[in-house]
Amino acid sequence: KTRCRANLKRLLTPRHIAFVGGKAVEDCINATRKSGFTGQIWAVHPKYTELAGVVCVPSLADLPEPPDATLIAVSRERTLDVVAELNAMGAGGAVSIVGEFAETGEDGAALQARLVTAAGDLALVGPNCLGVMNMFDGMAVWGGDNVFSPVMGDGVALISQSGYVAYSVTNVERALPLGYAISMGNQAVLNVADYIDAMLNDSRVRSIGLYLEGIVDIAAFSVAAMRAVKQGVPLVALKAGGTQESAELAQSHSGTLAVDNEIWSALFRRLAIVEVGSPKALIEALKLLGSPKPPKGNRIVAAANSGGYAA
């Protein structure tokens, strides 16, 4: 995965972003502009002459050079062809926002396996995801409108298996210096360990939040988590699937197999990962642990102006 991980860096800090799809990509193009991206924006469509004010070229082969980042918003079958072509031309990374892959059953899982083969060294995020944003540098390859708040100096990162959880956290105005947000989706090519490593390669990241429905590679996840411990970057995890019903929903949502939450909690304790029980707690923990001088121990005093709130 060495080259794939190098391409992930290109995806997160692109010089140019290509958009492949019809009218659905117009909101995505506008989101990229809104994020503060100052690089080149390209649109690819065989019939449209322009999308969101960007002149279209009919094919990827007509682009000036291989794009560092690409947002793909075409059918799942067509996605395979686009991904294969991007890999062949030496593109950096891509975000596939379309679903109906492994999360839908055996047929979708088979199609996703073909997608992985087609991707090769391409840093593919998704499928079935919302995208990535880097607000340290002003960039988003994102599946729609969002709040994009620039981060000056150090900040935190969010890696989420749910697009909606990523969307919700990134749109919360709670003084959270969110430098990176990554919606992983099905983790077909890149998984949570790859994203953690990418965040740890950026010294501006002080803490990393995780929303997980499952982990595809426990060994790689453990290695990445221990690297975070060594670098002094706290990991905060919110795990879905606390009940049988929610575990089954997680499986249908992102193709994740259900595992007893007590097992996950034991793993988190072993890897010094802070576990929280709600999105709000995830946000507040990230704010605390991402501060310039996070607490070194567990001796914390809380002060409140009401006995009821304190209780």
Residue ranges and their predicted role:
Residues 1-311:
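Catalytic-core regions of core metabolic enzymes
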